[in-house]
Regions:
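C-terminal intrinsically disordered, low-complexity extensions immediately downstream
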Residues: 1-79
Length: 79
């Protein structure tokens, strides 16, 4: 998974908001629907947010510090 600066910003955004939705990312990051949707799906794969729940926002499963630990683990695994 590619964790670029926009993805990092998206993860911080959903953790601060306490919920994750494509519309939140579209508004805050000024990205299109498709990109926002892919970001949410990638966050689910990384364990940052929970599964799709119909029209409700997804649950956020970690704090920012937990995310930093997970990111370091993912980056070390990629090396």
């Amino acid at each position: 998974l590619d964790i670029d600066s926009k993805m990092e910003e998206a993860i911080k955004c959903v953790i601060e908001a306490g919920q994750a939705s494509t519309s939140l990312l579209q508004r805050r990051l000024k990205v299109g629907y498709a990109r926002a949707g892919r970001m949410i799906d990638d966050m689910e794969q990384m364990g940052v947010v929970g599964p799709h729940q119909g029209s409700k926002p997804r649950d956020v499963l970690m704090t920012y510090n937990e995310w930093l630990e997970r990111r370091n683990a993912l980056e070390n695994r990629a090396d």
